[in-house]
């Protein structure tokens, strides 16, 4: 079984009205599900470097009548690359992105910058290459390595179990527990 965004998001303690950044939003699958979770009082920032994906998200949001998703053209690996305000985000979602990030130090620093002091980060990524359906084996970021990376910016693993499927892992990190 591969990761199921709908199931994972249903398990997350994200409150109505929260501000969420979906980093590396792709086609917006996670963004749209998160928009429903946070309700009209909340906001989802779909951050993506590929402009054609942002247009696709905007068109789909319009077609679905979703008004609380804002697209942001972003280089998520750079300081200020998300263009979001300092300490403005309750939840950061990093789904199937970590293995693609080249500048991981810049990436986690940008997450730390935008995350509120009480904020949380969900990381869902490949636990293995899985016969080349996932990333190349050399690009897989193991869960233990992700924990070390996020510990470098003061985030710690939360005691919440996320079932992300048999070929993925899911970890919630918090600034303060």
Language-model-derived ranges and their functions:
Residues 1-18:
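Conserved alpha-helix/loop element of class I SAM-dependent methyltransferases that forms part
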Residues 21, 27-80:
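Class I SAM-dependent methyltransferase SAM/SAH-binding core
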Residues 38-39, 101-102, 115-117:
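Helix-to-beta-strand junctions that scaffold the AdoMet/dcAdoMet cofactor pocket
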Residues 81-91:
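A short acidic, Gly/Pro-enriched loop at the edge of an enzyme's catalytic core
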Residues 89-103:
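A short SAM/SAH-binding and catalytic strip from SAM-dependent methyltransferases
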Residues 105-120:
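A short glycine-rich, Lys/Arg-flanked "PGG" loop and its adjoining helix->strand segment in the class I
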Residues 122-149:
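Conserved class I S-adenosyl-L-methionine
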Residues 159-177:
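Core SAM-dependent methyltransferase catalytic element
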């Amino acid at each position: 079984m591969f990761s199921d965004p709908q199931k994972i998001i249903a398990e997350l303690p994200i409150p109505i009205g929260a501000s969420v950044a979906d980093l590396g939003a792709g086609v917006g699958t996670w963004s749209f599900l998160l928009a429903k979770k946070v309700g009209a009082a909340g906001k989802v920032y779909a951050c993506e470097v590929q402009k054609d994906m942002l247009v696709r998200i905007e068109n789909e949001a319009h077609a679905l009548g979703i008004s609380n998703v804002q697209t942001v053209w972003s280089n998520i690996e750079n300081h200020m690359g998300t263009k979001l305000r300092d300490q403005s985000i309750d939840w950061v979602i990093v789904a199937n992105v970590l293995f693609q990030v080249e500048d991981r130090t810049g990436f986690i620093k940008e997450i730390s910058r935008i995350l509120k002091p009480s904020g949380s980060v969900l990381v869902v990524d490949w636990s293995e290459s899985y016969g080349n359906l996932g990333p190349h084996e050399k690009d897989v970021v193991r869960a233990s390595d992700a924990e070390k990376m996020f510990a470098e910016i003061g985030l710690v693993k939360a005691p919440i179990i996320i079932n992300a499927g048999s070929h993925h892992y899911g970890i919630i990190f918090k600034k303060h527990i």
